UniProtKB/Swiss-Prot annotation:
Protein's name according to its UniProt entry: Probable UDP-arabinopyranose mutase 1
Location(s) in or outside the cell: Secreted, Cell wall; Cell junction, Plasmodesma; Golgi apparatus
Cofactor: Mn(2+); Mg(2+)
UniProt GO MF annotations: UDP-arabinopyranose mutase activity
Length: 60
């Protein structure tokens, strides 16, 4: 994970066709966090959880 500095944009998707619009929309929370003085990080999560059980079996 990397900390995205205040005032800098970060790219979540490749900039092509519809993905560039998705990336533009996802920039809005970053601008809000910058305004509120909150940090934003991007990348893989610190803790990776994988379920050992099958959720469909658990529903029975």
């Amino acid at each position: 994970t990397i900390k995205v500095p205040e005032g800098f944009d970060y790219e979540l998707y490749n900039r092509n066709d519809i993905n560039r619009y998705v990336d533009a929309v996802l920039t809005i929370p970053k601008v809000i966090c910058d305004h509120l003085g909150l940090g934003v990080k991007t990348g893989l999560p610190y803790i990776w959880h994988s379920k050992a059980s099958n959720p469909f079996v658990n529903l029975k």
